[in-house]
UniProtKB/Swiss-Prot annotation:
GO molecular function: cAMP binding; identical protein binding; intracellular cAMP-activated cation channel activity involved in regulation of presynaptic membrane potential; intracellularly cAMP-activated cation channel activity; phosphatidylinositol-3,4,5-trisphosphate binding; phosphatidylinositol-4,5-bisphosphate binding; voltage-gated monoatomic cation channel activity; voltage-gated potassium channel activity
Record's function text: Hyperpolarization-activated ion channel that are permeable to sodium and potassium ions. Exhibits weak selectivity for potassium over sodium ions. Contributes to the native pacemaker currents in heart (If) and in neurons (Ih). Participates in cerebellar mechanisms of motor learning. May mediate responses to sour stimuli.
Gene: Hcn1
Example of a GO biological process term: negative regulation of action potential
Record keywords, A-Z: cAMP, cAMP-binding, Cell membrane, Glycoprotein, Ion channel, Ion transport, Ligand-gated ion channel, Membrane, Nucleotide-binding, Potassium, Potassium channel, Potassium transport, Sodium, Sodium channel, Sodium transport, Transmembrane, Transmembrane helix, Transport, Voltage-gated channel
Domain notes: The segment S4 is probably the voltage-sensor and is characterized by a series of positively charged amino acids at every third position.
Glycosylation sites: 327
Name of this chain's protein: Potassium/sodium hyperpolarization-activated cyclic nucleotide-gated channel 1
Biased composition (Basic and acidic residues): 900-910
Intramembrane-annotated stretches: 334-355
Amino acid sequence: MEGGGKPNSASNSRDDGNSVFPSKAPATGPVAADKRLGTPPGGGAAGKEHGNSVCFKVDGGGGEEPAGSFEDAEGPRRQYGFMQRQFTSMLQPGVNKFSLRMFGSQKAVEKEQERVKTAGFWIIHPYSDFRFYWDLIMLIMMVGNLVIIPVGITFFTEQTTTPWIIFNVASDTVFLLDLIMNFRTGTVNEDSSEIILDPKVIKMNYLKSWFVVDFISSIPVDYIFLIVEKGMDSEVYKTARALRIVRFTKILSLLRLLRLSRLIRYIHQWEEIFHMTYDLASAVVRIFNLIGMMLLLCHWDGCLQFLVPLLQDFPPDCWVSLNEMVNDSWGKQYSYALFKAMSHMLCIGYGAQAPVSMSDLWITMLSMIVGATCYAMFVGHATALIQSLDSSRRQYQEKYKQVEQYMSFHKLPADMRQKIHDYYEHRYQGKIFDEENILSELNDPLREEIVNFNCRKLVATMPLFANADPNFVTAMLSKLRFEVFQPGDYIIREGAVGKKMYFIQHGVAGVITKSSKEMKLTDGSYFGEICLLTKGRRTASVRADTYCRLYSLSVDNFNEVLEEYPMMRRAFETVAIDRLDRIGKKNSILLQKFQKDLNTGVFNNQENEILKQIVKHDREMVQAIPPINYPQMTALNCTSSTTTPTSRMRTQSPPVYTATSLSHSNLHSPSPSTQTPQPSAILSPCSYTTAVCSPPIQSPLATRTFHYASPTASQLSLMQQPQQQLPQSQVQQTQTQTQQQQQQQQQQQQQQQQQQQQQQQQQQQQQQQQQQQQQPQTPGSSTPKNEVHKSTQALHNTNLTKEVRPLSASQPSLPHEVSTLISRPHPTVGESLASIPQPVAAVHSTGLQAGSRSTVPQRVTLFRQMSSGAIPPNRGVPPAPPPPAAVQRESPSVLNTDPDAEKPRFASNL
């Protein structure tokens, strides 16, 4: 250095981060022989350089340059260290899908890598990348050896060709290396699933297991063959002794086929890898392994079929000599031998010719045994594979077979069997899963993710879920249960106790109420929440119009979820109040709670906006149907489901003016009443329209179901629709038919009451004497009185006489006064009640003429007699004024002294 340099400094040195020299280290470099160390000019003790400063002088110049770069000095060593690290890492388990599944986490894999480093030199981990690729190479080499070696030994006489020698020498070398590497490869302890990396334990385990088989299969037969060939002359080699040696080497080469054990082990390891990663790939690999093993055995059997005659020098009775194939090409010989072997193994024949010699016979039997075993294994594995590929469909088929046996055992009708079949098709769609058990085995996040995915269409179509908290939606969906309903099924019924609410995923359902309006619910709608909120009964019926796929929520789960989310409870309550208002109903519990929330200020502006949107969307989703043109829907709960065709025809007849409603006040009134008609009141056309258009009266009769008779007069007032009157000829014809039926019934009853005729004759004689005494005073009025007296007395004593018609579902018996009033013609459409002529007998006296008894038309439905013999009174019509005192004294039995006469009584089946 010129002018003296600082110690510990190097002039013109490059500061690249790697020029760090150890203290007191001699300067070395590749150019040290061509350059010499220099000192500063006029050097002295003070001008000496520090030992760590490496400088040199170039001839002919005073400049200084470094003696050599550290990178040049450490390059080979650094490259060797990199290769060593890479090779060492290949002996360790890598971080991949297989190792993560084996050890659980990346941290556990790193710990296993540290174990391999501390285990010793050249210890190979069984799950390392190096062992993976080595096993792949060995798999290919073994398949090649097991296919090529039998063909070469059997069909090729020249064993000294260069390709054959190269192939055999390379194979023997690779298998010897594999034998050595097995002593340095860790093993898996089957009891504890721990990887054993101790070299001594690995060696002992290998010596006790597969070492002998692997050593015999790895004997270098080709090396021995080459040594024997070089030690013999060509003339001696061709002698018979040499040919025997060659045959021995051929037989010895068959020991390589023991490498099949290695092939099976490696294939089993690959099956485990595929099984742990892909289940379907594992099944496919298993079936392909089975097919490949069968083909390999067929290949070996074909070579064996030709090798045995070859070792016997083709005797005359062998199959090769009989078919004259000794001098044919090896391809033709192999084809015939393979065909013969497959015929034996599949048990379909003997090939081209049946065996003749004893050796061919034994080989054929051996082939049949091996073939039958392989065929059974193949069928079993194939069956198991097919069943495992679609186990859910197989379970569905087994389940439906049980259902069919159940239907046959109980002898269910064909239409019911078809409904059950359709239900299973729509409910399970050909596959059965134990979904509840599957989801219960998963953790909560994964279960919630699956439920959200399965119900994504329901969430997308429901405005309630769209505006709700995601946690509420997840909690609600996790408690839903899937259900399917068929067209015509009543999902809920009005008046029933509600235990579930429903969400519609797919389908259309109709809401049926007592009013004439029906509403439709489609995808994304929900119903049944009102009774869950109020703990009451169903307010309407819901019927499935199409196949409906629903999700149900029980009342316990409903309350459990809403306790954690009070805002959503208020949303349900608001929608419930709006729905009740739309169908004309109210619920005091919901209204009081809603008013209480308003007074306490629970609702804020944001919540109000959300509730408005929910109610708005709920109204938009409900499809309202226009009012139905027939009024039967107004009495939906009043009519029986077993209505006869006659009663259905009656509901479409013109309005009927019943005699029970004709009181004295009505007869004397100048105009019909304009008030809301009562269930059994007389209706004019205008008042009838008012009754149909107005909501029905909530009376006991309006909610009563009559099971045995036709609709009563109160029901007809709600159900019948004004139409044009029937022609008089049809009315007369109907009356004639009714009269004939009554006469037949009267004759039958007369035969049954022969025992009572004597008592009736005595009563008639007494009545005739009274008539003779009263005839001058009131002519023509005594007979009706007596008849009325007889009929009412019989009804009061609950005894039916011949004067009273028998009670039946189609022809109820009535007092003669009522039948006489009904026999009058009906008023026209525009005629008022004042124009009806008043019956004289009804005004002046309580009796009627004896000859005025008429029949009741078939299209008229009247009250039936009760078990007590009285007619049910009408609560909607004011009672008639009492008759005169004279009439009361003469016929006291006409009056009804029963204190319960004003209570409503319904028809009963006698």
